[in-house]
Amino acid sequence: RMAGNAVRGSPTWQSRYGSLMQHMFSASNVSCEIVVDGKRRTIFKDVSLAIAPGEIVDLVGPSGSGKSSLLTAFARLNPRAHGDFVLQGHPASAFTPQQWRARIAYLPQKPVLLGDCVADAIRLPYTLAIRQSATQANGRKAKPVELLPDVSIRETLDAIGCADIDLGRAPHDLSGGQAARVSLARTLLTDPKVLLADEVDAGLDDENADKVAAILERAALNGMAVIRIRHRPPDGRATRIMRLADGMLTQIENESRVEISNGGGIA
C-alpha cells in the first residue's frame, strides 16, 4: 500500500523508512486505577509507548483490558490515569489541555454529529473555537463558514473517498459507515499530529470498515501518527500491533499470532 510495494511493518518498510523515524509522541510510566466496590483496581501499570510520524499502531486485547482508558490517558481525558507524555519533544506540561487535545485528537467509537446538515457538523470545531476567540480588529468575529467554506469541506471529503456524502444531508440520515467517515473527516480537518481512533469501525460491515481504514492510512502517509483500537483481523496497514492484557502492553511480532475470539474480535 506504499510506493515501491513496501508493505507497512515489513522489513522492507522498516529499512526504507525506519531510519527516518523520530518520535512524534511518547508515553511512559502510564498507570490507571479505578475504585470498584470500595477497592482499588489497577487497569494497567507503567505502560510505555512511542510512535513516529506516519506510523499506524494497532492496539488489541481482550474486552475490558483498558484499551480505551489508555487512549483517553494519552489524550489527557482520563482523570484516573497518570504518566509522562511528550509531543514533538515537548512535555505535556508545556501545553494547556486545549492545546494538547488540538494536537492529539481522540476519536470515540460512536460518532457524535451535531448540526442541521453534514457541513455544519464538520464545522463544529471551528464554531467552538470562534466562540472562545477574541474579536477581530474590525469588531466582528469570523463565521465558521468563512473559516471552513463548503468547497473546502467538499474537496476534503472527495479526497478521502467520501464523494457519496451530501453536505446538505441531515446527520441523522447518514448510514453508520457514512457517519463514521464524516466524524473522521471532521477530526482530520483540525489537522492533529496524533490521531487516537477508538474502534471507529465498530458495527460497520467489512466494506465500510475498509473505507475508514483507508482514510486513516492516507492520514498516516501524510505524516500523522495513528493509534487505532481494533477488534478485526490485521489488515496489513499497521506498522506495529500492540496487545494490552493483564495490565501490560506488549508487541506482537507476528501478525499470524493475533488471536481471534469466538465473537470475531481480536483477543
Task: Please report, for each region that a protein language model flagged, where it lies by residue.
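The feature captures the beta-strand-to-loop junction immediately N-terminal to the Walker
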Residues: 60-62
